[in-house]
Regions:
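Active-site beta-strand termini and strand-to-loop segments that position acidic
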Residues: 105, 110-116, 137-139
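C-terminal glycine/acidic-rich active-site capping loop/insertion
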Residues: 114, 140-212, 234, 243-273
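Glycine-rich phosphate/pyrophosphate-binding beta-alpha loops
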Residues: 74, 99, 123-131
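Conserved loop-to-helix N-cap of the C-terminal "lid" that shapes the substrate pocket in Rossmann-like
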Residues: 69-73, 208-214
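A general structural signal for well-ordered alpha-helical segments in protein cores
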Residues: 19-20, 76-77, 190, 194-195, ...
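Short arginine-rich
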Residues: 220-230
Length: 273
């Protein structure tokens, strides 16, 4: 804001994914109604011990400052807040070195509460095989399910809140239509972000992600960590000084790895999760 003449953008390439863009459109158009619940199971990040041993900096508090949340999940944490907004309260359960000989988290379950009373769960690990990538967002009018490259919408005949208050049968749920949602099929990824960045400079066109939005996903990651370290829920925005204090405690006792770094085959790592 101090330099409005400059362009500041984030490389959030997953926002260009046609499925996530369509979900964003449907949610923000009101098509699913008021948010009730969001669940993301993103556990198809499988990593072996060899992966973690391949660099002295990997999976250390001093080298990376975190594990699966900071290394594998930044784009998913950005996407979930881009789609439905930041929660107001977070409870995190980070298991450090649960499945690998590492000092940082490799298994996480986080619980979210949103300002309107909606709730969410975010589950991730680098130890599940074959793993799952399923994002489900439920509103009062419809549920969106993103899995296996498809977007399914289960559209209710009536807003659930209205149905609940007016239906005269105790066990009858509202009927719904299952729709496989069409997208434009475009998945521009990094080139699309760079093209938008250039277009913003040249013609003032919208960025894929304004740089000021970059803090949101990190705030969510830090909140999950801090809550887990403290053993109780935290509210957002978090106490940044307290977070840094707790992180520095872990950095101070971080283990120094020995041995040479090795190169690994990263083919298939950068997919369209």
């Amino acid at each position: 804001d101090r330099h409005p003449e400059l362009t500041f953008g984030m490389m959030f390439n997953q926002r260009t994914n046609c499925t996530y863009r369509k979900m964003h459109e449907l949610i923000h158009s009101g098509a699913i109604g008021d948010l009730k619940r969001v669940n993301w199971i993103i556990t198809d990040w499988y990593r072996t011990q060899f992966y973690y041993d391949s660099g002295a900096w990997r999976a250390t508090w001093a080298g990376e400052g975190g594990g699966v949340l900071l290394n594998q999940c930044p784009h998913q944490l950005d996407l979930v807040q881009w789609l439905v907004g930041l929660p107001c309260k977070v409870q995190g359960f980070c298991h450090e070195g649960k499945w690998h000989n590492i000092e940082v988290e490799d298994d996480v379950t986080a619980y979210f509460e949103y300002p309107n009373g909606a709730t969410g769960v975010f589950i991730t690990t680098t130890a599940d095989a074959p793993g799952t990538n399923r994002l489900e967002i439920t509103g009062t009018k419809a549920t969106l399910i993103c899995q296996d490259g498809k977007l399914i919408m289960k559209k209710l005949e009536m807003d659930e809140r209205e149905w609940c208050a007016t239906c005269q049968e105790g066990f009858r749920a509202p009927s719904y239509e299952t729709i496989e949602v069409e997208t434009d099929g475009q998945n521009g990824q990094h080139p699309a972000v760079l093209n938008a960045f250039a277009a913003h400079i040249l013609r003032g066109e919208p960025l894929v992600a304004d740089g000021r939005e970059g803090i949101n996903g990190l705030m969510l990651s830090n909140a999950i960590h801090l809550s887990s370290w403290l053993g109780h829920p935290v509210t957002l925005p978090i106490d940044e000084k307290l977070f840094l204090e707790k992180l520095n405690e872990r950095r101070a006792t971080s283990r120094v790895k020995t041995g040479e770094s090795v190169f690994s085959d990263t083919n298939g790592t950068y997919g369209s999760k």
